[in-house]
């Protein structure tokens, strides 16, 4: 593995704080809607980085499909048997020209992106802010932004912004809550980010985003059993794919009016307070998210 040296540049821009004493799920909904539809200026070095990471991920995906890696081949075959539902425009699997069910498309494409384990890694460590929970994660979720952008009619710039939004949410969650300490797989932070970003992109309200997040946290938490044992299964490489799939499913249900658990970060029986007890009315952490400039978690990702 060769880690590319990060370029040094002045850090500038604004952030939004979601305090532990607030409804952070609702706050994420407001943040997502503002980030996508009331955009502030993002500096070129951030846009260039998200473009580079996306291109890298596509290269990984095409290689995995070409070599017929098992998990992504099976999930792609599964997706190609489907068609878009209702008024949905659906999504395209890598290398295909026929639209398929969006949820199945996302699972297939994220699996392909992730198969070679060659994308960037964030380590959940921001010494300046003191947020150093140290959870890691990978930028495997760009197919969710592509699918949502197609459904929403986004142009390329809007879709890049959605990619950045997903990376920002999962990157900042990694700084404040160490999933691995509680045997929870790191892709869960990505699932929350995907559910929030997808719901907002398709015009969901802040309440819809809150519901989608609540569904992901209460119904679809992946444990690290998928990485344990002497012989690892296809589930390890496909963990991000299944996280993305369930996130999009939760988002679609929320958009159709399903009400998931509210205020889930302060829910005493959700994974956060259950594992890191805090007083009533408090989550275990503040959450701070970049809004403009180059103050984004993506700049802490190591490139392989």
Q: Where do the language-model regions lie?
A:
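N-terminal core-entry segment
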Residues: 2-295
């Amino acid at each position: 593995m060769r880690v590319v040296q990060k370029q040094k540049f002045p850090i500038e821009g604004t952030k939004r704080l979601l305090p532990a004493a607030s409804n952070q799920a609702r706050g994420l909904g407001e943040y997502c809607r503002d980030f996508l539809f009331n955009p502030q200026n993002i500096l070129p070095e951030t846009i260039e980085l998200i473009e580079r990471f996306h291109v890298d991920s596509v290269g990984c995906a095409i290689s995995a499909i070409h070599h017929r890696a098992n998990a992504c081949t099976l999930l792609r075959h599964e997706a190609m048997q489907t068609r878009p539902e209702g008024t949905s425009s659906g999504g395209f699997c890598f290398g295909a020209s026929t639209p398929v069910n969006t949820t199945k498309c996302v699972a297939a494409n994220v699996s392909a992106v992730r198969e070679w384990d060659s994308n960037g890694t964030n380590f959940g460590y921001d010494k300046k802010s003191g947020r150093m929970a140290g959870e890691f994660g990978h930028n495997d979720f760009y197919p969710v932004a592509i699918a949502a952008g197609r459904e929403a009619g986004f142009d390329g710039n809007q879709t890049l912004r959605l990619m950045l939004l997903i990376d920002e949410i999962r990157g900042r969650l990694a700084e404040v809550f160490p999933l691995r300490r509680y045997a929870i797989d790191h892709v869960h932070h990505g699932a929350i980010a995907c559910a929030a970003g997808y719901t907002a992109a398709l015009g969901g309200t802040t309440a819809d985003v809150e519901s989608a997040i609540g569904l992901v946290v209460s119904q679809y938490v992946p444990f690290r059993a998928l990485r344990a044992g002497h012989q690892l299964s296809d589930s390890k490489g496909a963990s991000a794919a299944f996280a993305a799939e369930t996130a999009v499913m939760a988002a679609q249900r929320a958009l159709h009016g399903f009400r998931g658990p509210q205020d889930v970060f302060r829910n005493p029986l959700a994974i956060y307070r259950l594992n890191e007890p805090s007083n009533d009315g408090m989550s275990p952490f503040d959450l701070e998210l970049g809004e403009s400039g180059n103050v984004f978690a993506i700049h802490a990702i190591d490139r392989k």
